[in-house]
Curated annotation (Swiss-Prot):
InterPro entries: Puta_zinc/iron-chelating_dom, UCP006173. Belongs to the UPF0260 family. Pfam families: CxxCxxCC. The lineage of its organism: Bacteria, Pseudomonadati, Pseudomonadota, Gammaproteobacteria, Enterobacterales. Transmembrane segments: none annotated. This is UPF0260 protein YcgN.
């Protein structure tokens, strides 16, 4: 009976992030693309400013990396979120499954692991599909800061 209950319980509810396989870890990503938007850091304060400028490798329509398996070859500054460095990424969105599970919170109802597709996530406007712009179209990066500091107003 206990084995049946264990198998009926989704892995993200019965395993810690450290206990997950690499495939389980990867499947937690909802594919919103928020990690793939460029961030700017104030050199004086280390404050991070979020932009709507997409990485060149991000397919804005699908919110997927064009070269995910080889992304570091194409974008040396691309981040790799791991179990070890997760605490360092305080800027992760409040909706991020990695962040939520690390904080002991449940996955949102629109998460692809619960719904079986990304449609609900896109419908809730969690993905960057509706706000992202191509890096090649950007002239002044300050015009694309989403959380503008007072000096940029």
């Amino acid at each position: 009976m206990a084995d049946t209950l264990m198998s009926d319980t989704p892995f993200w509810q019965r395993k810690t992030l450290d206990e997950m396989t690499d495939a389980e870890w990867e499947s937690l990503c909802d594919g919103c693309g928020q990690c793939c938007l460029h961030k700017l850091m104030d050199e004086d304060t280390d404050e991070i400013y979020f932009t709507n400028v997409a990485c060149r490798q991000l397919n804005i329509k699908t919110c997927q990396c064009r070269h995910y398996e080889r992304r570091f070859e194409f974008e040396p500054d691309c981040i790799k979120l791991t179990r070890e460095n997760l605490p360092d990424f305080e800027w992760l969105p409040m909706t991020c499954a990695y962040r939520l599970l690390a904080e002991g919170k449940p996955l949102p109802t629109w998460h692809p692991l619960l719904t079986g597709s990304k449609a609900a996530m896109h419908g809730e406007r969690i993905s960057v599909r509706h706000i992202a712009v191509k890096e090649s179209e950007v002239r002044d990066w300050q015009d694309h800061i989403l959380n503008k500091p007072s000096w940029a107003e």
